[in-house]
């Protein structure tokens, strides 16, 4: 008897930066969990944010966290509108990328 074992790949339910299995998902979170492109954008943005916060000094880190909280409110305002959510992630990634580029500039 032989068995075929498939590698375990992250599924949309487990890949987002939040638990897609929760029963109390907001409309924006549900759209992110249900849309692979948004799910991937969420993971990329959350990972970038985590790395960036680990590289910043405390005051700057706190400011970045405040910006992230404000951005999350904007994302929530999109509700389940995939186009709005896509634009929100693109804009936030641009901001985070610019912050990274600022770190690499010589003093």
Positions of PLM-derived features:
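N-terminal alpha-helical modules
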Residues: 9-107
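Bacterial N-terminal signal peptides
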Residues: 1-8
């Amino acid at each position: 008897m032989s068995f075929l074992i498939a590698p375990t790949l992250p599924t949309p339910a487990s890949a987002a930066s939040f638990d897609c299995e929760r029963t109390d998902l907001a409309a924006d979170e549900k759209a992110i969990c249900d849309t692979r492109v948004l799910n991937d954008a969420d993971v990329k943005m959350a990972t970038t944010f985590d790395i960036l916060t680990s590289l910043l000094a405390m005051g700057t880190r706190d400011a970045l966290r405040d910006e992230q909280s404000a951005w999350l409110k904007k994302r929530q305002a999109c509700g389940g509108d995939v186009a709005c959510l896509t634009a929100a992630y693109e804009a936030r990634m641009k901001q985070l990328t610019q912050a990274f580029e600022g770190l690499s500039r010589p003093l």
